[in-house]
């Protein structure tokens, strides 16, 4: 498992990490999880059009996630829930969590070879205590 947290140099960091992940994948399947601080597509945030130029939803950040997927990693939540609009982060401002104005910026990506083992991918948005909520996957071997 490789955990990441990406910030301003998202694209460059993700490219270097992607090279590492692809080399690691030559030896064993890979699970990548963490706070990517970026929503991938419109379904991954409550107000996509209002946020198109904002950090966390720039073209470069979205392309970074697309590159990860194109390299053969599966977005586990979106794979199992293609149309579900759930979020893993809400701003502390303006009652965002109460009004469910959130973003899905926390991810589990897995190697394609693990797809057959993926049983569940969940966002536990009922769990309070942070601006993020827990996410989980279940793999059965």
What are these regions (language model features)?
Residues 1-15:
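N-terminal low-complexity segments that are often proline-rich with Ser/Thr-Pro
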Residues 16-101, 105:
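Metal-dependent phosphoesterases centered on the DNase I-like endonuclease/exonuclease/phosphatase
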Residues 90-91, 119-125:
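Short, solvent-exposed helix-loop connector elements
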Residues 109:
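Hydrophobic alpha-helical positions that pack around
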Residues 114-117:
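Short helix-loop capping/hinge motifs at secondary-structure junctions, enriched
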Residues 122-141:
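Surface polyanion/phosphate-binding segment centered on an Asp-His-Pro turn
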């Amino acid at each position: 498992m490789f955990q990441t947290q990406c910030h301003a140099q998202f694209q460059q960091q993700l490219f270097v990490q992607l090279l590492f992940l692809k080399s690691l994948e030559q030896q064993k399947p890979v699970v990548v999880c963490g706070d990517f601080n970026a929503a991938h597509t419109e379904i991954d945030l409550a107000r996509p059009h209002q946020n198109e130029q904002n950090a966390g939803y720039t073209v470069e950040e979205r392309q970074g996630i697309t590159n990860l997927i194109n390299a053969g990693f599966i977005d586990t939540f979106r794979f199992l829930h293609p149309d579900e609009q759930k979020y893993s982060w809400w701003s502390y401002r303006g009652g965002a969590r109460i009004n469910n104005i959130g973003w899905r910026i926390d991810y589990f990506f897995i190697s394609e070879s693990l797809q057959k083992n993926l049983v569940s991918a969940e966002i536990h948005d009922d769990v309070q205590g942070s601006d993020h909520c827990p996410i989980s996957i279940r793999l059965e071997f």
